[in-house]
């Protein structure tokens, strides 16, 4: 659980450092979410194994490779500071879908066309933002 307890601070630091203007409406645009946590076989036993599956949000200001390297360095730093973890290093495996971070210039023709049509349909100005 030592790693789990440090994820929030890492998430906040990344969100502040990698901020993107089109994602400013999100307090934490690059979420690190432990979606699955499996440990132990009985409520009163101390688990000998824990498996965390994490959603690791990435910024348009970084590549997948640099984001992964930063997370791996984060885990390595925790392990180097903890005697037990330094001898029992966690296995890190990248699973499933990887949504590459992207930012599209709002002056791109497609963006302008969608924006223009939204104004026609909604009869008001639109705001171009990002999704996290």
Where are these regions (language model features)?
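Midchain, well-structured core segments that form catalytic/ion-binding scaffolds
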Residues: 1-83
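An extended, acidic, His-containing surface patch that forms the Zn2+-binding/catalytic region
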Residues: 1-36, 88-132
């Amino acid at each position: 659980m030592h790693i789990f307890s440090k994820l929030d601070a890492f998430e906040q630091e990344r969100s502040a450092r990698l901020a993107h203007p089109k994602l400013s409406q999100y307090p934490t645009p690059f979420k690190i979410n432990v979606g699955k946590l499996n440990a132990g076989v009985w409520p009163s036993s101390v688990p000998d194994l824990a498996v965390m599956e994490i959603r690791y949000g990435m910024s348009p200001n970084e590549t997948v490779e640099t984001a992964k390297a930063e997370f791996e360095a984060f885990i390595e730093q925790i392990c180097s500071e903890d005697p037990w973890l330094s001898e029992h290093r966690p296995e890190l495996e990248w699973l499933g879908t990887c949504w590459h971070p992207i930012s599209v210039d709002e002056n791109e023709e497609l963006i302008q066309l969608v924006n223009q049509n939204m104004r026609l349909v909604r009869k008001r100005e639109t705001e171009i933002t990002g999704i996290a």
